[in-house]
Amino acid sequence: MAEPTEAASQVPPAQSLEDQTLIVFARLMEGGQEDNETCRDLDELTKLLNDDYEARQKDKSRETICKVIDGDCVDTVLCYLDMRQPEIVRGHATLSTSAYLKAAGDDGSKKLSTFFFDRVRRGTYDDYIVAFCVAAATFPIVPDLTAELFLNEDFLPSLGTLMRRKWKSRKVETACLEMLNAACMNSLCREAINKYCIEWLEEIVDQDLSEAVRSMNADPNLQSDGGSISMRRHSEQVQYLAAVILAKLRAVPAKPAPGDNKSRIEPAVTSIEDLSGMFTKMILRDEDHGRKHSIEGLAYASLQPKVKESIVSNPELLQKLVKTLSEAQPRSPTTYGALSIFVNLTKYLPTLTEEEKKMNQLKAYANAAGKLGGPDPLNDDEHVAKRCKLVFDAGITPVLVTHSKNGSPASLGLVISIIFSLSVDRTLRGKLAQQGAVKLLLVSWMSLPQTEAASRRLAAQALARILISTNPALVFGGNRDTPIIAAVRPLVSIIPPDPAAQTRDLLPSFEALMALTNLASMDDDATRRSIINTAWNQIEEQMLASNTLVSKAAVELVCNLVQQPEAIALYAEETAKARNRLNVLLALADAPDAGTRSAAGGALASLTNFEGVIRGIINRDRGVKVILGMCVDDSEDIRHRGVFVVHNLVTAEGEVGELAREKVKGEGGVETLTECAKKSRSNDVVELTVQALKTLLGDQS
């Protein structure tokens, strides 16, 4: 036993987390590694930092490994964000930077600020490139901190001088524009760019590129060393990136300064339509170069109604956008940009209350000195519906189905938004189902986290719309692997009001009830049982809704559910709750709305096969009177249901049957049924009425 103990004592002690961190930094500082080795080291650093942060959340007294990360270490990681690094390395470095800034807190923010301003003060092209690249990468990670650096009073004014030097570096310009592009996410930064950089951006966009410049720009290795060359014209890539920034500034205009009495409507030097035209030309060319920026730019430009119309009126462009999306990598900027374009093309304006409409008119009047009069007519429902049809015809649905399988929650939200808009058109719903939209929506609803509540509600509502207009047997039948019961929970989830909404929108509730009614009409006990188990309380609540359409939809659903023993028991049991439910159903059978009366009558027609329900009707004041009232309704369908209920009452066996016949006769049942027979034209109604009369009269004799 002594030998193993001695051997174990010779094993070197495990390295501390601090030592592991320093070793990783030593490898990263040394350089000369293959890209995959660098990525592996960056991933190891990211894990160490994330583990450190989580451990300190549990134990605040624990020391952080960030204490061994000095300025040189931070410099090392941030330099891997340089645009001259391979894209895969930059991606892993972004994750490491994010993990460090989260773990290091205020100290990390100070080191980032020191790094940025030190590089800018040095003022070489290399330093500018790294500083701009770091700012562009950290804007999405720490937007407030990066905006603070960007808005430093000495920083932006210096860019104009830098960009107008006689000797220019395309990489400096590109890095600067990438930073400005990222900065547009912040409203104060947009205002600053408008103030200090707009003329330079216009200058870049307005230049007429020659074939020589285009050819030079197509060679990615021409300036791979990042040095300076004399350029008479900016590269095409830079021109399109500048156009993207202008599109963001035009799409989200800056707020007017206080006391500014100038007209709020001023023509831009380069209009959003001009920029859209530039992006369109690039997208239509069979070149990958510049397409990413053009897609991003068009995503912002397509917020404008005129641009939306120009896109859908160009079939070649629409097909190209669908093709670009189909070929784009999941979770890529191109995917997100293309999806954003289709969201903008298909998005309907929200339905407003009268009060909200008046408030919007007042705001429009105030913001445009009386020169704008409400929403653009190109955004009305008619124009949006036409755009949706054109987008659908371009073949977008199968592409969305493919992207939904590997998308992030953000991109999945965009996919759902597009399907949601397409589902407004009843004529498209069956085709959407055929092309896989139902499974897309079901999987999306189940896979999205609870934090994405808005997207989940849209998915459920789009699902409801499709299931209202299609035969569930065709959607879920055959050899399909998605069971019909899978649709129940998403639909039930939108019956209650949206807790995040300021005003109640009844449409989701109505559409969910209608779709569930369609599902409950199928010969599927498991589905009906699932609806009863998960939604009964909510259905009962909606039966009493003040909105007639919602109430009717809920009663129609109950009419289908009472074919199920579990639902029958809810009415037939001799309990106070069952009696209350029956009283509600009888009240609805006497409702002003014919559809509600018909649905309630249908439910009673099924339920009165059971003694407990018959006893409940005859024991309730006006219970039989309501049923007889249905027998003389102006609607043949309602008369049929009323007579069916009366027939069930008077033909019941035993004591309850005798009580029912006595009650019906006492309420003038013979006279009512006679009138019903005279009033009806349907053989089924007349025959059933005669049978009920014979039973009553036979009992009387």
Positions of predicted regions on the chain:
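Alpha-helical solenoid repeat architecture
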Residues: 2-9, 39-59, 79, 88-104, ...
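Acidic, Ser/Thr- and Gly/Pro-rich intrinsically disordered linkers and low-complexity segments
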Residues: 24, 28-29, 205-236, 325-334, ...
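Buried hydrophobic core positions in alpha-solenoid tandem helical repeats
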Residues: 24-28, 76-81, 112-120, 158-163, ...
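Extended amphipathic alpha-helical scaffolding regions
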Residues: 24-29, 61-65, 69-84, 93-101, ...
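Short inter-helical turns and helix N-cap capping residues of alpha-solenoid HEAT/ARM repeat scaffolds
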Residues: 34, 85-86, 123-124, 166-169, ...
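Short sequence/structural elements of tandem HEAT/ARM alpha-solenoid repeats
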Residues: 66-72, 106-115, 148-154, 191-199, ...
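Acidic, serine/threonine- and proline-enriched intrinsically disordered linkers and terminal tails
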Residues: 339-399
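C-terminal interaction modules of eukaryotic adaptor/scaffold proteins
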Residues: 526, 570, 615-616, 637-644, ...
